């Protein structure tokens, strides 16, 4: 590819807040689209205040989710400003993406039906909470709610202890990614037909997507899975073990890997025992096998086990903390942590992709509230 900005020439209007829609907008912007973020003039996106840490008075979280964008303010309670936004969309936008509560844009005359009628080439992307239909359609939603309601939290934590949530906004971020996938598919279809259309994604649907394996298993056998801490229901051993100086992850995901694991830890006979021969046997006899392995791993430090397991080709990893992750030689080699040398000085995680070996560079810092009003909105008046 000749460019790391393949979406150059596209214009995206993002009426987004918090994480999901802004993350989608950030991806599109880093890939070259002109993304115009629309905020309420009375404080803007609440994410601006999600700190500490703050950089020049704005939360680092806002910079992470809103780089590569221009910024304007529109008061949706002001008909004149709404009309200005509508003209901006109709004149310039290829894509509109929003995550306001269901029906909000309809009330202000910015419905999908109206805008796609006025501009048939527009791709109108709704990033919802529970989806665009059903009894929960009108409910608001945040990432923790979806981890709970969609069953993800029922799988996390130790058996017999309270459920826990994934500590990052995995549902929000993944919904942003699905939104980008859907938008790009709609734009590809527009290449053939000349028409845009309406794209719907939601936090709840994303959660169900993450739950593909456990839901499929339940539909097959009717059994509700138990919580296994760092492990999973279908594979054993596939979890973290305590060593003499910390925890490490061990993933013997096949019968062959299990046999090699047993040799590496000095217990080759374990793999020959009928109760542990196949993965299905090990799943049934998890409570017998895991304590045996746990006792063995406690006898030596992580470095010793890592050397033995690496030599045997067994996937394994220490449980790294963030200070270790950001200074890890592999992280450095990938160049995924990018610096902005201007003002404000920032270091953020870049897009996790490359084109012909080149990663899209840090395009632009997040906009100040309304910083592009004069150039962008006022021209539509």
Stretches found by the model and what they are:
Residues 1-182, 186-195, 339-340, 364, ...:
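N-terminal helix-loop segment corresponding to the beta1-alpha1 unit
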Residues 1-11, 226, 242, 322-381:
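Terminal low-complexity tails and localization/encapsulation signals of metabolic enzymes
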Residues 35, 310-324:
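Short, well-structured beta-strand/strand-turn elements
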Residues 42, 130-131, 203-208, 245-247, ...:
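Glycine-rich beta-alpha junction loops
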Residues 75, 98, 201-204, 250-252:
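Active-site-adjacent beta-strand anchor residues
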Residues 132, 160-168, 191-207, 226-233, ...:
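Conserved Rossmann-fold dehydrogenase catalytic segment
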Residues 176-196, 209-221, 262-268:
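Oxidoreductase and adenylate-handling cofactor-binding alpha/beta cores
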